Design a protein with these regions (language model features):
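N-terminal glycine/threonine-rich, aromatic-flanked beta-hairpin/loop signature
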Residues: 23-66, 93
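Short, exposed beta-strand-loop hairpins at the edges of beta-sheets
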Residues: 78-96
């Protein structure tokens, strides 16, 4: 679990106001996502089990067959965050994790 000083101040309120913001926990990382409605983008803070922390920004890309895609906002790197529905994020191993 992550400490309160890592979680965005409005994460609990955001969970009720949009389909993406919140904390998603897997066996290897905790992801804190903050959705920006005005830019249709997501800021990700990933805290891995080994203590490494990475931050990335993603922009809305597409919705296809019920899956919503946000692509990494970078010219150098490629990556996506995918959602199966509100609060249901796909993980790198293909499983779905539920927003906490």
């Amino acid at each position: 679990m992550i400490s309160a000083d890592i979680m965005p101040m409005d994460a609990s309120k955001s969970n009720q106001n949009d389909d993406y913001s919140g904390t998603y926990v897997t066996s290897y990382a905790t992801y804190v996502l903050t959705y920006n409605k005005s830019t249709n983008s997501i800021h990700e803070k990933a805290i891995y089990s080994d203590g490494e922390v990475f931050e990335h920004d993603y922009i809305y890309s597409d919705s296809y067959n019920g899956i919503t895609y946000f692509d990494l906002d970078s010219n150098e790197d490629k990556g996506s965050i995918m959602f199966a529905g509100p609060g249901l994020m796909y993980t790198y191993d293909g499983s779905v994790t539920i927003r906490q």
